[in-house]
UniProtKB/Swiss-Prot annotation:
Keyword check for Hydrolase: no
UniProt cross-references to InterPro entries, sorted A to Z: AAA+_ATPase (IPR003593), ABC2_TM (IPR013525), ABC_transporter-like_ATP-bd (IPR003439), ABCA (IPR026082), P-loop_NTPase (IPR027417), R2_ABCA1-4-like (IPR056264)
Domain ABC transporter: residue ranges: 478-713, 1288-1513
Family recorded in the similarity comment: Belongs to the ABC transporter superfamily. ABCA family.
Keywords linked to the UniProt accession: ATP-binding, Glycoprotein, Golgi apparatus, Membrane, Nucleotide-binding, Repeat, Translocase, Transmembrane, Transmembrane helix, Transport
Chain ranges passing through the membrane: 31-51, 222-242, 268-288, 297-317, 327-347, 355-375, 397-417, 854-874, 1007-1027, 1062-1082, 1094-1114, 1127-1147, 1150-1170, 1194-1214
Protein species of origin: Homo sapiens
Inducing factors: Up-regulated during monocyte differentiation into macrophages. Down-regulated by cholesterol loading of macrophages.
Enzyme Commission identifier(s): 7.6.2.-
Protein name per the record: ATP-binding cassette sub-family A member 6
Tissue spec. comment: Widely expressed with higher expression in liver.
Length: 1617
């Protein structure tokens, strides 16, 4: 066994190189990835430049003077409620000297008081009495009192040379003065002791203020939020890339030996590099703009770098848990926002250390706490430095450690869940796998009792299973024992495999056959280790696949080719091979040699430097096969390996597999019975999860009663009854299967070959009975399969595939077709246009309704838009709540016995009297305050920054005077200390009550608070007006999947497509705008005055704005239709452009001319500009007429129509662009109509050289048909001198583009009732030809006529090569949309759809979304859509690809029913030559863009295929040499094709075969003399003819500018619909 050593380092390096190349080559995505992060950094820099970040130099203690120095003459005091006690208190309060001249008003209730206060802003103050000793003061916050309890931005400032602090507002603007007056009144009324002098003489002193860095309000919070989300763009792309690759490629790479750690490391390392660079960038911005001043570069960089790494690991974890990129992004964003914002609690509160450590497990929380540590130290002019004598910096090491630990935890969890939570039903580990050294899988245990009962023998010898040849006994490589597989479906368990029991042998090629859903792929998934059997066991070379260790060993020698292509599109062919070679563990020194070997064997040297995304589907399939055979694995598991390959490439693959047959185990599944017949030594046929039969082709054909097909060519005098009697005379059990005007086809049993010599001898004498000739062919494996499936067989026309119709199915097909002829005339002109508009509107609505991703994105963007508005309201609510607080002592001061707790301290009492102040001390202790008493001689209290406040007591006993000293950081210190003194005096007068004072916010519904965010309403307008690209760029997807082309070919008017889309998009956008208006109104309704004229103006402008923006985006979508959709990027452009336009108008002071100009030039800004326009006009009107309501003038109403002029302009531009790309479709369009133009066929640049005589005849016939004026004589399809050139890629900037020619002067026509097959290898020009005929691309030269008309519209049914379907729509919805597009009336459409569904057995799939249908059903749907309507022309581009034989039979019958006895013509391209033989009246073979031959199949065989194929199977291997010698003796020119074991194959020239009677006589003698088991003789097939012609394309021999088309890239679509 060829074992290879897998190195994690080698795999990681290879994947890292792949990721780097991906980033380098996908420049737009990488630019977006980097650009958004850089742009966010620049926004931070811009935001920082608008903020003043100034170092406050410090301030000496300040004496603010006495309380009664306040001048209150401008104040108004309003109180409530009015009672005797409150009046008494307020009367006494008014006597205070500081309130002299102050107006004191009583209000009966709070509502009335609020009205008075609002009318007298900002100098009115309110008082609400709760009881005698409790009241609430209402001041204008921010002016008379601070906004917050704490302030980390700037508690002191330098106001033009005068230092001031926030807490002094209480003292200087009347709050403490009014508090003191009220407290004095309460104490005097309660105790009858005068305290006016004691309280009014209180002086205020601020402690000294140390230097610090001043910042604007919420400056720190906003920057932390910016930094927290700075890596969000990167997170988006990480989740997108990782989720996509994990879903698409990771499991396949694991089958090749990829280690999980290598996958995650490769992505982790490249994004670690990105994080490293972006962290440097953002750190430079932070230090350069001095957002943080004192902390060094390296500390900030490490914090950001570790935080970014932890986010990468978090994305890995969430992508494993959630599996979808959209959900991953949303969840990571919300977790980052939530955990990060939770960290703000550390800013304002001191959390318990244990809780803080636990929360640090969330990396955003750890990052936020780290930033807060830096900011707090920066605030006090300290930085994070090492070594740090104070020890404050060392907490940052803990933060670094936690971020590093978080990243490791997330990464380990990602690796763990990656093993136990796979996609779907794939193999996965047990949750406790790490406890078991063997790493057992979940579900690996099978039913032990079953295993014990298993027998060693594969199957007893019976009629269904051919006995294994003796030479293979003991070579059992794969042993499958009682394997069952169940899947969980919605309706319960579904059994995919039902007790399979058979062996696969080394040295044999084994094919697994079966209809779609038979269980082939399920079995292969079990064999390649992707899935685990529900029951039973599988061993490969005696290693059990259920054991992880065994599976790893098997994977080292196994190559797997799945149904889908596995290449990385962004890598070249050579790079793909090199990458997978390294993943497979091929030694680095041997990688290049191995890659070159594969390129040579698959003939891909000339495309080795082409990117995989530019390859044709066939070339991609060859690349996938090449990846599979890298390293020459001993076991090959191939799931439909040749799907999409042309016969020549398929023959190459077959040859490679035959060469590897010896000492290898090759198992493949296929839908092609011919492939199995030719390639496989042993066929295993499955049905509904069970094994039906197994054996060689000859065994299966003999067992199921199928033998030879004898075709007799007849003329007019031939009597079928006489000929049938003649045949049955020689072979009684012969059966007449097909009878038509040209021939009779009989089935002859295989065991009757001994009678063939006499039969053919007599046939040679039957020319007088009307038999002009005969030929014989073997039955195909396809017929065996159809018989096993219980269906009627389709035998090959002429000598291989004569259609044997199942009458019931055929009747259904003919009934379905007849429904079209029974219909009324289809709707046309404006009626059809309206029907199509509504059909497109319905289509758009259904897509929008089911695009969960788009709706979630819209919801997220809407949430982002409304976020500032919510934040504003929350902040206002918090502001109201925070200011409405009680001035409690415990806010700043500790209680006795309480442990020190930030920010509380003890209260310092300084005795400046010459006596004992024990009475005052005692009164303070009653207030539960921890006191510290000292003498004034020791300290004056102004330098003690370790205290929040101090009271200096002076005077003499019983007549104290007080000074209050406050730390400038404690904003509410003065009211609290004044209350402490007041309550102390109460206690000294033996009163036990305490005065309680609260502060309440001023009764404003909207507070003018700048938070650093845009105004919420403005931001809402800005974002929602930029949201439109998410809604309206669906046409790009339609273009890319060619759905738009298909709709146009089906008869859709171009204007109907856009108008139908707009009908839904505009309506949806209007709904969003109305919702925005509603939110805006609810937010501002208390102070927003809306007149009927403003409402009318909005009613006018809103639909116009929605329409203009929608058609503007349609125009953009059309221009960039070949690129990615990038809705988010366009939304950002709209947002940015609107912001710039608003800034321009703002700078120009909202000049109306500039405002209107910006509205016209930038469609996305029009609505926001109109809102601004209304506001400016309202202000102008108010200045002129203060009392009158604002009314719009006639000029103002003209501005409302700007969006409508824009809409008309964009519709016109869109029409012009459509006109440029395709004039034909516009000629009948009722809206975009243009005048009919004469056909302008360009002369062909090439003249035909050395053409076959049949091609020349067809060219003359086509030219004649083109010029004839008799419509009845015109063919259905005329393709005259078609030539197509594409511009190739430049090799360098200065070189010219070389032309690539897809079609070279081809001419042919299709008559009514005829099916013409267009054959050729990949790249021969078939699809280009059919695209020219369909009108998708414009010919470089030549012309096309369909049913006598050059326009395609309404004349064509087209089944393209790819599935042009909408994944989220159901099968029924597709049929209904296309029926409406083709103009079928509702009743006719229902009838036609019902009959087609019945004919193709699609009832169960009617309401299933396309994305959940099998590949075969989706292909059927494409074909059925082409049949809808009564189109006289059908173009079918490989219609049966991927469909099982049963489905193919239905399709073939449908095609024949469509053409039979009708005026329709069909042009068919196919790689399935049996399909061509079954259906086509004529075939044309294209090679390198030219027609090489054309004619009936038998004509081509007679002309080009001169050989017969002889197969002999001997019973004893010892006879092989003798038989070979005898055959060469009997047939001297026989060429040995293949010798394998007991099977011999030869090619015999016609000269050696004719007459057939003598040939069969010789073969019967050989069979008798050498005891042959069986033999077969058949004429050369169409495939042999095709392969011979295809060699011309392989050899090349063309002009220099043309590559051999086998090596062409997929040609670009230059002329789109």
């Amino acid at each position: 066994m060829n074992m290879k050593q897998k190195s994690v380092y080698q795999q990681t390096k290879a994947l890292l190189c792949k990721n780097f190349l991906k980033k380098w080559r996908m420049k737009r995505e990488s630019l977006l990835e980097w650009g958004l992060s850089i742009l966010l950094g620049l926004c931070i820099a811009l935001f920082s430049s608008s903020m003043r970040n100034v170092q406050f130099p410090g301030m000496a203690p300040q004496n603010l003077g006495r309380v009664d120095k306040f001048n209150s003459s401008s104040l108004m005091v309003v109180y409530t409620p009015i009672s005797n006690l409150t009046q008494q208190i307020m009367n006494k309060t008014a006597l205070a000297p500081l309130l002299k001249g102050t107006s004191v008003i009583g209000a009966p209730n709070k509502t009335h008081m609020d009205e008075i206060l609002l009318e007298n802003l900002p100098y009115a103050m309110g008082i609400i009495f709760n009881e005698t000793f409790s009241y609430k003061l209402i001041f204008f916050q921010g002016y008379n009192s601070p906004l917050w309890k704490e302030d980390f931005s700037a508690h002191c400032w330098d106001g033009y040379g005068e230092f001031s602090c926030t807490l002094t507002k209480y003292w200087n603007r009347g709050f403490v003065a009014l508090q003191t007056a009220i407290n004095t009144a309460i104490i005097e009324i309660t105790t009858n002791h005068p305290v006016m002098e004691e309280l009014m003489s209180v002086t205020a002193i601020t402690m000294k203020t140390l230097p610090f860095i001043t910042k604007n309000l919420l400056h720190n919070e906003m920057f932390i939020l910016f930094f927290l989300l700075h890596f969000s763009p990167l997170v988006y792309f990480i989740s997108l890339n990782v989720t996509k690759e994990r879903k698409k490629s990771k499991n396949l790479m694991k089958m090749m030996g990829l280690q999980d750690s290598a996958f995650w490391l490769s992505w982790g390392l490249i994004y670690a590099g990105f994080i490293f660079i972006i962290s440097i960038f953002v750190t430079i911005i932070i230090t350069f703009t001095q957002i943080i001043v004192m902390t060094g570069f390296m500390v900030i960089f490490i914090l950001f770098f570790l935080y970014g790494l932890s986010l990468v690991a978090l994305v890995f974890l969430m992508s494993v848990l959630l599996k979808k990129a959209v959900l991953t992004n949303l969840v990571v964003f919300l977790l980052t926002l939530f955990w990060g914002c939770l960290g703000f609690t550390v800013f304002y509160e001191q959390l318990p250390s244990s809780l803080e450590w636990i929360l640090n497990i969330c990396s955003p929380f750890a990052f936020t706490t780290g930033m807060i540590q830096i900011i707090k130290l920066d605030y006090n002019l300290n930085g994070v430095i090492f070594p740090d004598p104070s020890g404050d910096s060392y907490t940052m090491i803990a933060t670094f450690s936690m971020l590093l630990l978080d990243g490791l935890i997330y990464l380990l969890l990602a690796l763990y869940f990656d093993k136990i939570l796979p996609y779907g039903d794939e193999r996965h580990y047990s949750p406790l796998f790490f406890l078991n050294s063997s790493s057992c899988f979940q579900h690996q245990r099978t039913n032990a009792k079953v295993i014990e009962k298993e027998i060693d023998a594969e199957h007893p010898s019976d009629d269904y299973f051919e006995p294994v040849a003796p030479e293979f006994q003991g070579k059992e490589a794969i042993r499958i024992r009682n394997v069952k597989k169940e899947y969980k479906g919605k309706s319960g368990k579904v059994e995919a495999l039902k007790g399979l029991l058979f062996d696969i042998y080394e040295g044999q090629i084994t094919a697994i056959l079966g209809h779609s859903g038979a269980g082939k792929s399920s079995l292969l998934n079990i064999l390649n280790g992707l899935s685990v059997p529900t029951e039973g066991s599988v061993t490969i070379y005696n290693k059990n696949l259920s054991e992880m260790q065994d599976l790893e060993e098997i994977r080292k020698i196994t190559g797997v080719c799945p149904q889908f292509n596995v290449q990385f599109d962004i890598l070249t062919v050579k790079e793909n091979l090199s990458l997978f070679a390294k993943i497979k563990g091929i030694h680095l020194k041997e990688v290049e040699q191995e890659v070159q070997r594969i390129l040579l064997e698959l003939d891909m040297q000339n495309i080795q430097d082409n990117l995989a995304k530019h390859l044709s589907e066939g070339q991609k399939r060859k690349l996938t096969f090449g990846i599979t055979i890298l390293g020459d694995p001993q076991i090959l598991l191939l799931d439909e390996p040749t799907t999409g390959l042309d016969p020549f490439s398929r023959d190459q693959v077959w040859s490679l597999l035959r060469e590897r047959r010896a000492d290898h185990v090759i198992l493949f599944s296929t839908q092609s019975m011919d492939e199995a017949d030719i390639l496989a030594d042993r066929k295993v046929i499955m049905s509904n999860g069970r094994l039906k039969c197994a054996g060689s082709s000859m065994f299966l054909k003999r067992r199921w009663g199928l033998g030879y097909h004898l075709s007799l060519h007849r003329n007019e005098i031939c009597n079928p009854e006489q000929i049938t009697s003649f045949i049955t005379h020689h072979i009684p059990d012969a059966k007449l299967k097909t009878e038509n005007k040209e021939k009779l086809v009989y089935t002859l049993p295989l065991e009757r070959t001994n009678t063939f010599p006499d039969l053919f001898s007599d046939l040679d004498k039957c020319s007088d009975q009307g038999v002009t000739g005969y030929d014989i062919s073997m039955s195909t494996l396809n017929e065996v399969f159809m018989k096993l499936e219980g269906q009627s067989t389709i035998e090959q026309d002429f000598e291989q595939v004569e259609m044997i119709r199942d009458s019931e199915s055929l009747n259904e097909m003919e009934l379905a077709h007849s429904s079209f002829s029974e219909m009324q005339t289809a709707v046309s002109d404006m009626g059809l246009w309206r029907m199509q508009v509504f059909a497109m509107a319905r289509l758009r609505f259904l897509k929008l309704k089911r695009q969960t991703k788009v709706l979630l994105t819209l919801l997220l963007v809407f949430g982002i838009a409304i976020f500032p508005l919510i934040v504003e309201n929350i902040m206002y609510a918090m502001l109201n709540e925070k200011i409405d607080w009680e001035f409690k002592n415990e806010l700043y001061f500790l209680s006795p016995g309480q442990l020190p707790q930030e920010p509380r301290t003890s209260l310092l009492i300084i005795n400046n009297t010459e006596s004992n102040i024990e009475d005052f001390i005692k009164s303070l202790k009653h207030q539960n305050i921890l006191l510290e008493v000292d003498d004034f001689e020791n300290r004056n209290g102004t330098d003690g920054l370790s205290y929040n406040g101090a009271i200096i007591v002076s005077g003499k006993q019983k007549d104290y005077r007080f000074s209050v000293v406050c730390n400038t950081k404690r904003l509410h210190c003065f009211p609290i200390l004044m209350n402490i003194i007041s309550n102390g005096l109460l206690q000294m007068f033996n009163h036990t009550q305490h005065i309680r004072i609260e502060s309440s916010p001023f009764p404003l519904s909207h507070i003018g608070l700048w938070t650093g965010l845009p105004d919420g309403s403005f931001f809402l307008f800005l974002v929602l007006c930029s949201i439109s690209p998410y809604i309206t760029m669906g046409s790009i997807s339609d273009y890319k999947k060619n759905a738009k082309s298909q709709l146009w070919i089906s008869g859709l008017y171009t204007s109907a497509y856009w108008c139908g889309q707009a009908l839904v998009d505009v309506s949806f956008f209007i709904l969003i705008l109305l919702l925005m208006y509603l939110i805006f109104y609810i937010e501002n309704m208390q102070y927003l005055l809306i007149t009927s004229q403003i409402v009318f103006a909005l009613v006018i402008v809103t639909p116009g704005y929605a329409a203009s923006l929608v058609f503007f985006i349609y125009m953009i979508s059309f221009i960039f239709r070949k690129r990615r959709k990038n809705s988010g990027l366009w939304s950002f452009y709209f947002f940015f452009a609107s912001t710039i336009m608003f800034s321009i108008t703002l700078i120009n002071h909202f000049d109306l001319s500039i405002l209107i100009t910006t509205m016209v030039l930038v469609p996305s800004y029009t609505l926001l500009g109109f809102k601004t326009f209304l506001e400016v006009r309202d202000q102008e009107h108010y200045r002129e007429f203060p009392e009158a309501n604002f009314e719009l003038s006639a000029t103002d109403f003209l501005v409302c129509f700007i969006p409508y002029f824009q809409t008309l302009l964009f519709v016109f531009v869109l029409r012009c662009m459509e006109l440029k790309c395709g004039k034909k479709r516009m000629r009948k369009d009722p809206v975009f109509r243009i005048s009919p133009q004469s056909r302008d066929a360009k002369p062909n640049p090439e003249e035909p050289i050395d053409e076959d005589e049949d091609i020349q005849t067809e060219r003359i016939r086509t030219a004649t048909a083109l010029t004839t004026s008799i419509l009845d004589e015109k063919p259905v399809i005329i393709a005259s001198c078609l030539h197509k050139e594409y511009a190739g890629q430049k090799k360098s900037c200065f070189s010219k583009r070389k032309k690539k020619i897809a079609a070279r002067n081809i001419s042919f026509c299709v008559q009514e009732g005829e099916i013409l097959g267009l054959l050729g290898p990949n790249g021969a020009g078939k699809s280009s030809s059919i695209r020219m005929i369909s009108g998708i691309t414009k010919p470089t030269a030549g012309e096309v006529e369909l049913k006598g008309c050059s326009s395609v519209l309404g004349h064509l049914g087209y089944c393209p090569q790819e599935n042009v379907l909408w994944p989220m729509l159901t099968l029924r919805e597709h049929l209904e949309v296309y029926a409406a597009v083709k103009g079928l009336r509702k009743a006719d459409a229902r009838l036609a759809i019902a009959r087609l569904v019945s004919a193709f057995k699609l009832h169960e799939q009617l309401n299933v979304p396309v994305q959940k249908l099998t590949a075969g059903i989706t292909r059927k749907l494409c074909f059925v859509l082409s049949l809808l309507g009564n189109s006289p022309v059908l173009l079918l581009d490989e219609p049966s690809t991927g469909i099982d034989p049963t489905g193919q039979q239905q399709m073939w019958q449908a095609i024949q029913a469509v053409v039979k006895n009708t005026e329709r013509g069909v042009l068919l391209t196919t790689h399935n030559l049996a399909e061509a033989e079954a259906l086509c009246d004529r075939v044309a073979i294209m090679v390198s863009g030219r027609l090489r031959c054309i004619g009936s199949i038998q004509h081509l065989k007679n002309k080009l295929g001169k050989d017969y194929i002889l197969e002999l199977k001997v019973k004893e291997t010892s006879q092989v040499t003798l038989v070979h010698t005898e055959i060469l003796k009997l047939f001297p020119q026989a060429a040995g094709q293949e010798r394998y074991s007991s099977l011999l194959t030869y090619k015999l020239p016609v000269a050696d075969v004719y007459p057939l009677s003598q040939t069969f006589h010789k073969l019967e003698a050989v069979k008798h003399n050498f005891n042959l088991e069986e033999y077969s003789l058949s004429q050369c097939t169409l495939e042999k003819v095709f392969l011979e012609l295809s060699k011309e394309q392989e050899v090349g021999n063309f002009d220099e500018e043309i590559d051999t088309t086998m090596r062409w890239k997929l040609l670009p679509h230059s002329d789109e619909p």
